């Protein structure tokens, strides 16, 4: 019984797709080699995987020479503006470098997805163990950095606390000195004010009691006229009568 027709379509299962690619690729490379040996043909085979990895086979000594021959056959004799062999070599080298970088980029993306817990199905036991060690190492580094950051913050806060404590202590000392300085300069301020007011009042009383004597050109003996008023008090002439000699003959 013959084998049924296989429907050609993209394989959805990733693992099955990779397995099929590896088998068909090896078979294709084997067929190209057999064709070049059995038929003495110049065969060049270039394969790129879906991840950008390059697989090639060339029956001649140089893939570049086969490509130049292919270009001549398809596009005729090279024109003056056609790149030379050196230019093609540079272009091919650049392309290979690009493929290497792309492969590296894909590997880094794949590693990143694995670290995030994605696409872990195709990984083997050793790869999973290696991934676990990487995660443990990364976790230790993160914890160490976090601890160091917290210690730095704690040291900064302690330094600020010491500065604030010193500032508070200095302000308290200045405030205490400000209260004590007026008392040291004038400790009996209230007494001085009291005596000052008393002395001023005594001066006013003395000035009111002792009136200045007015010198008159004519000495008047006896009381002054009644126009001075009864409540004016004794005058200077009245005081003089007390000590003048009393002349009985004048009466």
UniProtKB/Swiss-Prot annotation:
Disruption phenotype: Triple mutations in the SEP1, SEP2 and SEP3 genes result in the replacement of the stamens and petals by sepals and of the carpels by a new mutant flower with sepaloid organs. Gene3D superfamilies: Transcription factor, MADS-box. The keyword Transcription regulation applies. InterPro entries: MADS-box/MEF2_TF, MEF2-like_N, TF_Kbox, TF_MADSbox, TF_MADSbox_sf. Pfam families: K-box (PF01486), SRF-TF (PF00319). Forms homodimers. Heterodimer with AP1 or AG capable of binding to CArG-box sequences. Binds AP3/PI to form a ternary complex. Interacts with AGL16. Interacts with TT16/AGL32. This is Developmental protein SEPALLATA 3. It comes from Arabidopsis thaliana (Mouse-ear cress). The gene is SEP3.
